[in-house]
């Protein structure tokens, strides 16, 4: 697991989410050293942001497809 400031785009949403879940479990367990926990937290933030970005991209793509399928569709604001 690399702790770069950005995530590579070749990781899938599912892989990022799975890694984020593992980080949360490890931090909640409280068995890591402070330094390791901080590094894990930093990686977790990157993964969270990446997952949010992917979800937003998917939502926008679905909205675009829906608009193309029916130009009269009214889209409601949704929170990601």
From Swiss-Prot:
Q: What is its EC number?
A: 3.1.11.6
Which positions form S-S bridges? none
Give the similarity note.
Answer: Belongs to the XseB family.
MF GO annotations? exodeoxyribonuclease VII activity
**Gene responsible for this protein:** xseB
Location comes to: Cytoplasm
What reaction does this enzyme carry out catalytically? Exonucleolytic cleavage in either 5'- to 3'- or 3'- to 5'-direction to yield nucleoside 5'-phosphates
Q: Which organism is it from?
A: Rickettsia typhi (strain ATCC VR-144 / Wilmington)
The broad enzyme category this protein falls into is hydrolase
Q: Per its record, how is this protein called by name?
A: Exodeoxyribonuclease 7 small subunit
Taxonomy-wise, where does this protein's organism fall, top ranks first?
Bacteria, Pseudomonadati, Pseudomonadota, Alphaproteobacteria, Rickettsiales
């Amino acid at each position: 697991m690399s702790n770069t400031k950005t995530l590579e785009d070749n990781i899938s949403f599912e892989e990022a989410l799975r890694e984020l879940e593992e980080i949360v479990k490890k931090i909640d367990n409280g068995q890591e050293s402070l330094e390791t926990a901080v590094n894990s937290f930093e990686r977790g933030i990157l993964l969270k942001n990446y997952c949010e970005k992917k979800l937003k991209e998917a939502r926008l793509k679905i909205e675009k497809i829906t608009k193309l399928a029916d130009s009269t569709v009214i889209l409601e604001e949704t929170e990601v």
